[in-house]
Amino acid sequence: MDDAIFKYKTLSEKVFTSKSNDPKATFDHMVLEREIKDVVATSVIGGQSPSIQLMDSRTDLCRTFVVATSRRAGGAVRLRSYGTRDADPFPASIWQAGRATSAAPTFFAPIEIDDVVYGDGGTGCNNPTKEAIAEAGNIWPNRAIGIVISIGTGLENALELKDEPTQLSNLAKFFLQNTSPKNVFKLTVAEYAVRCLTSCEMVHREISEHPDHDILDGNYFRLNVPQGMGTIGLAEWDKLKNMIALTNRYMEHGEIRESKRKMANLLRDPRRASRSL
């Protein structure tokens, strides 16, 4: 975890200060690719090769998947490092999977892998908790889930965008596109960000308010900083210290301390969940 945080600090500055030549993207996807490859090549599993495959048949490793969207077929695609009874591992390199799940519309250009164009998880899968629950059920159909921990990126204050329309009519967009394309692009980015934050919370509410008691019974947790994060933009890599301070303060709240205690107990003994069903 410490390595991941350190790598992100270095990567974020380089990636989010780049500029894209693509009018539909904010940042240069080539810089993102280069930085992901560097992380892979310098990792323990990379062995100095940036093109190591996502698939790993070793049974002692954690099973990992990320979510992307197939632009043509639509819907979420799970890019797995492992095979299941119904699907093979995703046939691509680690850096390609990283690019696919990072290709957020308006921020990075999509990536084509084996003639399929992938973007990020889209506004419906930026919170992939349901995907994770479904995946666990597919792999271990007869086992109870011990614990689910969902980690958010902060809650947005909707009033911060009150002076800007969150949706434009087609006529208004056409007019702006021909008179001020930069402004319409900025509004598109704002719309996307609001949809992402809204969809993430919708998934959380669906799970917490309507849990399947055969799967989740007091073992679902969501950690999400409620205030302050909404003012920090994706490109503001230089505000990581602010994010850390806000998160540390949030994690010390009494309610969160109690949640941490419960999570620690379940992580130490996941069988507690099975016995409680």
Regions found by a protein language model. Give the residues of each.
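Conserved catalytic cores and adjacent C-terminal regulatory segments
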Residues: 1-277
